[in-house]
Each structure stands twice: as structure tokens, then as C-alpha cells.
Amino acid sequence: TFPSPTDQVLSELGLKARSALDCCPIYKFTNFSKGVPQNGTPFIHLCRKVMNMDKHTERIEIFKSTLKLIEQGWYITPSGEQMELPPAMWTIDESKMYSKPFVVDKPKFKKTTIRVKNMDCVEYAMTLIDRGYNPALLNLADLYTPGGLVEYGSGAQEENLCRRSNLVVSLYQFSEMRVRQYPSLDLIVSEDQYPMDERYGGIYSGCVGFFRGPESEGYSLLDNPYGISVISVAAIAGPRIGKDGMMPREEENLTLDKIRTIFRIGMDNGHDSLVLSAFGCGAFANPPAHIAKLFHQVMEEPEFKNAFRLIAFAILDGYRTGLRHNPEGNLLPFQKEFDCVPQNGTTAL
């Protein structure tokens, strides 16, 4: 007997049940090519019923809990201590929306170190902070909706970040509808509003309080929250892809300007490092090999060469890999582009 979705979120027993539901081979197949089990029900429908819908429910409950913690401003850690969250007003005051190109005049570093890591982007940003860096974390944002589909339990990266932090208090102020929907957050409607500009749009959220672990650990509350600044920029959704696996020139040029916007926002706010990801290569189906090349191209442009002490791509291959747009997954194309394929299974920081 498995706990209800709410109990699964809140209890250790529930987490074990969740793991069992996701991993247990419940159905036997008579036709693997069509994915039809013996009872004749299409496998995808069974997945939605037994697994995915439960996950969506759990994510929705986690987000509701996150909103309550943001409102009260503190939580009880796993070790039993009361931990104060970074004041939401800090994040709100340090937030701004960008919609035009601009140039940042700042000193350059002697060189930029490039890393491609197979790990959670938030955890890698925390590692950099512990090592003395001042990173900004890229949020793979939705162009039209702050937080994407977080209220509906989506598993994409932006929604994951919103469940783990107070990022929404920054993003929601740029949506009059969200400000009215969540009066308890005490937000003031910004003059700048969603949707973001398609070419130069981005949002900087300073000192976002991250206080939950990754989904793989049940979004457990952290003993020590981290303040991490976030850059939200939206990739192209569903670009055209040729037989060579590349986007046409129009989409390429648009993506280049989006990448330049990410870099400029990081520079404009004094960050010495960026934690990026496979920009748009999941739900938005951008080709990772081409996206990696475009990042590399922008890094070598005079405006951005050595603008950062470190640029890292933290990439976890999820369920949307091995598809037409990313047959090798998302991690490997970036490793190849930046010559970061691990040797003997190890890589540096």
C-alpha cells in the first residue's frame, strides 16, 4: 500500500514508495515495438496513470509548500534548527528586466576556464560559491510565463528552480496576473512586464534564496540555504532543424543574440562566473551540438573573450534525450565542443 501523493511528499516512507513506483517493472509486454502490455492498454497511458501524474502531483504539492515557506520567511531544517530565509525583498530589489542590447565596460580576466559537468546546476553553483566564486546561474526560462508551468507540476529546469527557491518572487513581479493571483507574497507590479523581448529579453534576479535539494533527493530542505543570483533567458521553442542537425541562419542569429544577452547580464551585475546549461535542448528541442558551437562562438567574440573567470555547463541528461534533435543526449555534444570529455571518469572542478 502506497501513501497518498501528499504523504509521499512529506514522509520518508513516501519517498521510498515513490522510488518503488518509478523503478518497479509492473507490466509485462507482448509487443515491445508498440509498447502494449498484455492487458492491451498503451504503455504511455499506464505511465501517465501510474508514474507521471503522481510526479506532477508531488511537484505541485512541493511548490505549494515552497510558497508557504517563502511567505513565513523561515523553515525547520532536517537537523531540527529554525533557518531564516534570505528576505524576499532583497531578491525583489535586486531584480530587473532587460529588453535592449547594451555594452558593459569592465576589466577582463587573463583567461576563462571552461567546464562541462554532469551534475545539477544549483549544486554546482553552490560548489563555486564555496570555492570563492561569484556565479550567476542560468534559468532556462519561458518567454511568456514567469516560472513556466511550475503550478502544473512540469519537470523542466525553470520549474525545478522555482520549487527549490524564492525565484518566483522576482519573476512574478513582472506579471500583473501573478501579482493579483498571489496577494500573500506582497508583490508590487513592475512597469516591465512579460513577455520578455524575443531577441534581447532577460531578467536578473539577485540573491535568490535556494533552500531545497534536487528532485532526486525529494526536494529535501537544506541545512544551509544559499543565495544565488539567477539570469532568466528563454531559448527558441521548437526551432527548425536541417538534416545536418543545424538550425537555419535566422534561428542561429536569434540564438546568438540570446547568448550575448546572458553574458551581458552577468557582466553588468559584476559576476566572475556563469553556470549555464544545454540552452533550450530539453523541452524546447534545440540541437545541443549547434547550441554548444554558438556558445563557443560568442565566448571568442572580443566583447566577451575572457569576460569571466569561469564558465561552466552543468548538464543532466533527462528523459528528453536520444531524440531527433539530440541523438547523443545533451551532455556529450557540449563535452566534445569544449574538449571536456572526461578521462578515466574524472574531471576537474
Outline where the language-model segments fall.
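Extreme N-terminal basic, low-complexity initiation segments
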Residues: 1-9, 15
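Macrodomain-like recognition of ADP-ribose-binding/processing modules
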Residues: 14, 21, 29-35, 39-274, ...
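Basic, glycine-rich
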Residues: 26
